């Protein structure tokens, strides 16, 4: 599991930062990539990374402001042009389906893969399979905006091979049957219950990716005990009132949410273009004063998520 930040700026592109898009690479877990927001020129940013459009399985849109969706029609079309045939699902607020349909229709773009658009109308679980589930809550922004909590389900423990070898059980197909929890009878009549030869389960990871938001309780709830919290930091602490007026957060408020939620790690993004060059490091300094395990994303930077 690895983050690749494709765009980390706020509102409009700048020389140093493109607008919002985050890839969550789940190559080891499911051989796919999930994308969170898709601002203008996202597909161009992708060209500079290991992200492959054909591997994008899901796109989660936080809200319908242009800096979060204007790259979507182009990416959907290019995925088809590049030979993508596997299904893709887009999740987002009401209106995202109309936006996609109109853009593709007017431009006569025909995608050659199954494309599903799921409009989120209420909070709760928007996706679940045997590996992950994704929950969402409304945030505090100028228009309807959602944050996402991605929960990896606990992973089955490893087969206790040494224990089996000590009992004289030789490696072979029987190991798989025991791993699957079957009850197996050996040639000498010994009965083995596979569940007794499985180690403790490995705790799944929790990832929280928030859209644009003021400091709010929903952010804390989504981030509770997260291994990684990705939070916007549009403004510095001295501009807290301005952040509130424009429905955004400061770096210090992001750190406060991480602290309250008992998150393990905080990554700041959605940085205003007023912070050019190294001036953005002041945002990082302010956040670390409150929550030390904070990093700030820059375009094309990757962040592995350890198990």
UniProtKB/Swiss-Prot annotation:
Cofactor: Zn(2+)
One matching Pfam family: Lactamase_B
Cofactor binding summary note: Binds 2 Zn(2+) ions.
The keyword Nuclease appears for this protein: yes
GO MF, one example: zinc ion binding
Active site as annotated: 67 (proton acceptor)
CDD domains reported in the protein's UniProt record: RNaseZ_ZiPD-like_MBL-fold
Binding of Zn(2+) 2, residues: 67-68, 212, 270
SUPFAM superfamilies named among the record's database cross-references: Metallo-hydrolase/oxidoreductase (SSF56281)
Domain of life: Bacteria
Keywords per UniProt: Endonuclease, Hydrolase, Metal-binding, Nuclease, tRNA processing, Zinc
Reactions the enzyme catalyzes: Endonucleolytic cleavage of RNA, removing extra 3' nucleotides from tRNA precursor, generating 3' termini of tRNAs. A 3'-hydroxy group is left at the tRNA terminus and a 5'-phosphoryl group is left at the trailer molecule
UniProt binding sites for Zn(2+) 1: 63, 65, 141, 212
Coiled coil (residue ranges): none
Keyword Cell division (UniProt): no
InterPro entries: Metallo-B-lactamas, RibonucZ/Hydroxyglut_hydro, RNase_Z/BN
EC number in record: 3.1.26.11
Family the entry assigns: Belongs to the RNase Z family.
Functional summary from the UniProt entry: Zinc phosphodiesterase, which displays some tRNA 3'-processing endonuclease activity. Probably involved in tRNA maturation, by removing a 3'-trailer from precursor tRNA.
Subunit-structure text: Homodimer.
Name listed for the protein in its UniProt record: Ribonuclease Z
């Amino acid at each position: 599991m690895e983050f690749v930040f494709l765009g980390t700026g706020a509102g409009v592109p700048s020389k140093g930062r493109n607008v919002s898009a985050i890839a969550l690479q789940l190559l080891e877990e499911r051989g796919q990539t999930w994308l969170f927001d898709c601002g203008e020129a996202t597909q161009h940013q992708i060209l500079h990374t290991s992200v492959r459009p054909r591997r994008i399985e899901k796109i989660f849109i936080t809200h319908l402001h242009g800096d979060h969706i204007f790259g979507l029609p182009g990416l959907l079309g290019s995925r088809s042009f590049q030979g993508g045939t596997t299904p893709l699902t887009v999740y987002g607020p009401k209106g995202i389906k109309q936006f996609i349909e109109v853009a593709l229709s007017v431009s006569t773009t025909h995608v050659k893969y199954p494309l599903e658009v799921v409009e989120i109308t209420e909070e709760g679980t928007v996706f679940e399979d045997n590996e992950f589930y994704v929950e969402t809550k409304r945030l505090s922004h100028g228009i309807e905006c959602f944050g996402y909590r991605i929960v990896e389900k606990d992973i089955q423990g490893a087969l206790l091979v040494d224990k089996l070898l000590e009992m004289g059980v030789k490696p072979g197909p029987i190991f798989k049957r025991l791993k699957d929890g079957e009850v197996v009878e050996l040639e000498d009549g010994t009965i083995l219950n596979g569940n007794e030869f499985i180690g403790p389960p490995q705790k799944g990871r929790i990832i929280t990716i928030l859209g644009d938001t003021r400091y709010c309780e929903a952010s804390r709830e989504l981030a509770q005990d997260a291994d990684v919290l990705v939070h916007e930091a549009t403004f510095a602490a001295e501009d807290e009132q301005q952040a509130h007026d424009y429905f955004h957060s400061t770096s210090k408020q992001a750190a406060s949410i991480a602290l309250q939620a008992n998150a393990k790690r905080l990554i700041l993004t959605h940085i205003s273009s007023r912070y050019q060059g190294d001036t953005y490091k002041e945002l990082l300094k302010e956040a670390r004063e409150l929550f030390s395990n904070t990093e700030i994303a820059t375009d094309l930077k990757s962040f592995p998520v350890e198990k």
